[in-house]
Amino acid sequence: MKTVSALCLVAAFLSAEASAVTVVGNAGTLGANGVVTLPPTGDPSYGWVSTNGGAPGGGLPYILPGINGGIGNTNGSTLRSDLFAANAGDNLQFYFNYVTTDGAGFADYGWARLLDASNNEIALLFTARTKPSGSIIPGFGMPAPSATLTPAAVPIIGGAPTWAPLGISSGTCFTTGCGYTGWVQADYSIVSSGNYVLEYGVTNWSDTYYDSGLAFSGSTIAGAPINTETTVPVPAAAWLFGSGFTVLMGAVRRKSRA
């Protein structure tokens, strides 16, 4: 498994043509692992972002007003694609799989956004966040997706998910709502011609215990690949740093919730 882990912005230059994927926090590529199978695109690997090893505040750059009094991000990770050109009417397509070990009132969330060349938001394509029942897209307190999803309803596949990017949280679950979505297809029609960036992200909400992640694959525009691959390897120990502290603080959190 290749990882990119940092507490500041890093650029992974992917070719001699100055194309770049930018990462905040912890991201990488991986093959079939735990509950995350190979993507339906047939690719031998997929990209991922995880709150494990995430950067402080590394979530959406704004607080969604419907989330329990407006409490915001604590830590998280984002990955932004290389800049790509698109014409009005072009179809943006990708696949994602949201995985979480945190539930109940502390549910984390993942998302994808379409940004312009200056990184201004054009569309919040989807958000995924656990809720007591029904589709977790959108989750509680979240806006409706701008992208069309297949399947349209996305319930959580419950249980304590095992997945390496979750670090020490893999195989654990805080109360109800843990699990994964399985692979979901997203499609979005570009409104105006221009240059764009595709962003994937995941964040811890309210605290930093019990991690979540987002796998993604098959990012294309009008059928042409969008570069989202990270290529700068970081030893696994780097993104597992602090695991013992996480276990200790997780125990404190469980006690405080009792």
What would you call each of these model-derived segments?
Residues 233-252:
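A short, hydrophobic C-terminal helix/tail in secreted or cell-surface proteins
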Residues 6-9, 25-27:
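Short helix-onset patch at the extreme N-terminus, typifying the N->h transition
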Residues 5, 230-233:
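Serine/threonine-rich, low-complexity intrinsically disordered segments
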Residues 21-229:
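Aromatic (Trp/Tyr/Phe) and Gly/Pro-enriched flexible surface segments
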Residues 13-17:
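N-terminal signal peptide c-region/cleavage motif recognized by signal peptidases
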Residues 2-8, 237-239:
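Sec-dependent signal peptide recognition
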Residues 255-258:
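Short, charged juxtamembrane terminal tails flanking transmembrane helices
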